[in-house]
Amino acid sequence: MHTNLLLENLIQGALQEIGKLGLCSELNCQYRRTYARLKIFAEKRNIDSYSSALIRSFLEDIEQKYIAGAIGSSRRTHLRRASLLLRDYVENEAIEWKTYVVNPKPMPTSQEFLLLYSRFIDNLTFYGRSENTIQSSRNLVRQFLLFLEDNGCSTLSMVSLNMVPSFFQHLLATYNSTSIRTVASHIRSFLRFAEGGERLLPLVPSRCVRSKTIIPILSYKEHDALKSVLKTRKVPLRDKAIILLALRTGLRAVDIVGMKLEDIDWVNDTISIIQSKTGKPFKIPLTADVGNVLSSYILNERPKTENPCVFLRSLAPFRPLSGHSACYALVRKSFYQAGIRLGNERKGIHVIRHSAASRMLSKGVPVTTISSMLGHSNKTSTDIYLSTDAESMRGCAIDLAEIPMNCGGLR
């Protein structure tokens, strides 16, 4: 931690560290203006040294101005970020570009619940559960423990038998019935892990509704329009490569943005990945069109950086893309440029992934092969793609002419 807490010196040091992040000149100017604003705020209070109380007071002033409508949401976010970056610089003598949570989610206050919660999450990490699984467990188990606390419990031994069903009934106000299935799975895992949780296990719903809706895919017209726009310069090389990968392989967004440069075998025309959801290694063919766009992106458009990930932000700091949100944005933009799905229709990598699976099926690719490419640990999960294959479904239809009828026809 810095020992010289003179505000002017700390601000100059923080600005130098921010300058090393490679941000655009306009953003660097914004930080200088923000810190000038902080200095004026401090001078009006006869303060010339940094303190956590000064930052808290400045953040409170920002919040009051935001509530009063004096500043907008983006301005509020930037002012908060600049303040918290300065705090990190003072405490760590360095600045790391990261996301700051404006309103942290409430946590249980019971010491036993907090200990159980942290041990359970550590256990998931130890056994190599995916980041998505761990994040879901964090959220759902936290909600469960908060619900128990709201009902007067501070230990699992205090939980009455009606509280677990009441928790799931409570969730129906915000979760649909299909999502309850996921919640039940995470709570069941937590209770199996927690000492004293076995008593409550039978109370977790075991039979939950599972949706079997017909999944959305691109029509042939939409598919052709998307392929056409990908051949133009309207779409950046990075976005072309991501969309083509999804179209050709059906990979999940998280697996695409997690690809490393070393995963690509240019000699044998393959890509080797560890699937995020299953944790299993998988090798897919690198087709000529995907390979050409990938190589063009890496050689001509990708930022020059030591980061091992293939797909990076186009603006500094050059970090990997942030999974679903980044992919959704670039797919939506490409759909717009192709003139498709301009309304409320489903968009994003998931639609392209569904479309890839459906087209593989229509070309006679075995369901087991498709299941492996999609990363389904349960092979029956791929059966839903049969609902998008119109020709195969027609082949399953019963010819009513073969059924004897006692009346003139269907009524």
What are these regions (language model features)?
Residues 284, 329-372:
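Short, basic (Lys/Arg/His-rich) helix/loop patches that form interaction surfaces
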Residues 249, 258-292:
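Conserved tyrosine-mediated DNA breakage-rejoining catalytic core shared by Y-recombinases
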Residues 401-411:
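C-terminal secondary-structure termini that scaffold catalytic or DNA-interacting sites
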Residues 217, 275, 374-399:
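Catalytic-site neighborhood detector that most strongly recognizes the C-terminal catalytic loop/helix
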Residues 11-26, 32-107, 118-214, 229:
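N-terminal core-binding DNA-recognition domain of tyrosine recombinases/integrases
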Residues 224-253:
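Basic, Lys/Arg- and aromatic-enriched nucleic-acid-binding interface segment
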Residues 264-266, 336, 344-345, 365-384, ...:
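Short, polar N-cap/turn motifs at the start of nucleic acid-interacting alpha helices
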Residues 278-295, 308-332:
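C-terminal catalytic core of Y-nucleophile DNA break-rejoin enzymes
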